[in-house]
Amino acid sequence: VLIIMGLSASHKVWHPELIDGLAAGGYRVVLLDNRDVGQSSRTEVKGKLWLAWQLLKYRIGLKVKSPYALTDMAADAVAVLDALDIERAHVVGASMGGMIGQIVAYDYPQRTQSLVSIMSTTWAKHLPPPGQEQEDGISNMNESSDEQAADLEELGFYPRALPNQVTAILNAGDRTERVRQIAAPTL
């Protein structure tokens, strides 16, 4: 089971009882840390003003810049499977991790045994965008001091990853048609 967490969160956020239960059920559990969080490599992280500018550009329909894409993060997930010599996996993702899981399932169908996409989205145009409360929460988390960031990292959250990961999400576009084509059992 390949388990992918969402925006700015590491594998530490998954509840140990879930992981232990899967392992006790005979599953090999692989907890993935996305780029810029946890035990994964770091990209040059953009700042608060850069993120605010990208969010404004997105709101008015302009192209958003991002250091990487969700498709890159899906390729990272498959590279982890390759490194562990795992041919096929049940893919479980939460929030942004669910988006990455969707991409794994339709770009790498031969590697996907099933998909569970938790509290995620296809980013369909008819769905409402994140509200001001969510954007404020992202901005506030991005403004954390070094001490606050260290405390959050201890819990598994990496606020400095927000600009890069948020812009990767904004650039991903509507995946509705691609998700409809997923052949693996999907929940």
Go through the PLM ranges and name each one.
Residues 130-172:
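The alpha/beta-hydrolase serine catalytic core
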Residues 28, 87-90, 111-114:
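Structural signature of beta-strand start/N-cap positions in the alpha/beta core
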Residues 99-107, 113-142:
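Flexible "cap/lid" loop of the alpha/beta hydrolase fold
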Residues 5, 89, 93-95:
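Conserved alpha/beta-hydrolase "nucleophile elbow" surrounding the catalytic nucleophile
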